[in-house]
Amino acid sequence: MVLLLLCAGIASARQPLRFKDGKFKMVQFTDIHWDPKSAGCEATEHTIKSVLEIEKPDLAILTGDIVTSDPALEGWKSIIRIFEEEKMRFDVTMGNHDAEYLDKQTIYDLLVKSPYFVGSHGPKEIKGCGNHVLPIYGSKQSDKVASLLYCIDSNDYPETEDLGHYDWIHFNQIEWYRDQSKNFTAGNGGEPLPALAFFHIALPEYRHLIGKKTTWGRCDEGDACAADVNSGMFASFVDCKDVMGVFVGHDHDNDFLGQEKNIVLAYGRVTGKDAYGEFIRGGRVVELYEGKRQFDTWITTPEGKEFAYYYPSGITSIDEEGPYLPAQKVQPKKQGVAYTYYEGEFEQTADMYAGKKVKEGVLSNFNISEAPAKDYFGYDFRSLIRIPEKGVYYFYVSSDDGAKLFIDGKEIVDNDGSHSLKCVEGKVALEAGFHEVKLLYFESYMGESLKVRMVGRSTDKLISDDMLFLPE
């Protein structure tokens, strides 16, 4: 009986990765820093097994600096044993310290012997080891790939110190990724498949997130310790349009995440007891949605779950705690937007009221195309917006020149001042129903534009005519 159960477990591990009931969950463990001689291994193993027990994922991905002391071979056997005991399929990407104790080829020779390891050595003709892509198949169509996981070696150190401290993802690796992406896209009728990427060292673009109000989590390192050379991996992710999120480790005192060019750049949570840093040890969970460019992610430790971040909206479970603006007690009958049109030379939206009031009227939306003047004019738009469901919403106002958006009298977006085309966002928690919306806009000279977009957990659209109603 025991043998039959063992064989059944191994057979299940060798099945293709597949969505279940429309979801696929994985846990990223990073910077385990396993030292076979250390008593800290017991705590590290407890962390891994506790997170697996809490989350019960479909896959674990280890993103580098896994075994970082001798005897390394025994250390890797211990790591493999943990996941085999848990009957958990797992994958591995290399960190900059892993090959200091055992060469990468030998590491992968050992890994592929485990029936629970789903990765591979990767192509020999490109830089690094373990570059591969994992297809995740749909829950209903057994032969249809629904999503992709790219596992990439971010390499170790450059050939000379004048190139910086850390190596980078090389051109032939990027070319390999682009070929894989192109082929999977072609096989999906020309539509890029939703994908994630996992490796060890952060891309230089992670630095763009530091200090932004839309970035969540901690940057206790004070920086993203990336390569000095930017080889263009991120630009290829943008160009190929499949990767939704990138997940790395390396910087133990960072666990922040945010979006750059509509791609999430995220750190995992340091896992190993013997790694430096004060964070509670744990793992980052990522849950994909079948057939959608959507995922949720959060950190889980033996002490429990931390806040969740929802892609693509950028909304978090902290946002959802409120407070929420209550809906107006109105039942408007007519759709539309009331406006007052002004002319004059303005530097701020507030300057409009000192200008010449030319006319008033009703439009179907926030539309400036019917302005009588080409330059030097402004609009005061007023409407009731129908919010379909209670939730947190981002409002994006793209304007040339200035604009301000208010909901229920509260300033949500400040894109004021004379400037070229620029997009500014703001967020607000709203009860379902009607809310007063006021949009101020002015045009100075040389180009005019105004667009308003609303993004919620299940909404991403330009505000449409059927959402707007005339105030009573």
Regions found by a protein language model. Give the residues of each.
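Hydrophobic h-region of N-terminal signal peptides that target proteins for export
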Residues: 4-12
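N-terminal active-site segment of His-dependent metallophosphoesterases
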Residues: 12-78
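Extended active-site neighborhood of metal-dependent phosphoesterases/phosphodiesterases
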Residues: 14, 77-190, 284-290
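Binuclear metal-dependent phosphoesterase catalytic core
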Residues: 20, 29, 133-137, 143, ...
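Structural recognition of the beta-strand scaffold that forms the well-ordered cores
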Residues: 25-29, 58-63, 68, 89-94, ...
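Active-site environment of divalent metal-dependent phosphoester hydrolases
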Residues: 35-37, 68-73, 92-103, 157-160, ...
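His/acidic metal-ligating clusters that form di-metal
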Residues: 56-58, 148-151, 163-255
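Acidic/polar, compositionally biased interaction segments
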Residues: 323-472
